[in-house]
């Protein structure tokens, strides 16, 4: 998925308003950032399901931890760096 597809998914948004997540298998998924995701001290929910429901971000901790759930109930612990998540 490239930034053109990101714009297609989130029409009218800049790329810096979209959170990119790269999974272990190299697939990338994208999620809209909520306004307070990097400033709230508590976990905030990102209310956006992408890729037709296959992947869903259920919560993100601004202190650099996020969790992704897949439909197969697998979870991945991810690290947040400069607005992007990496496994």
What are these regions (language model features)?
Residues 2-87:
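Conserved RNA-binding domains used in RNP assembly and mRNA/RNA metabolism
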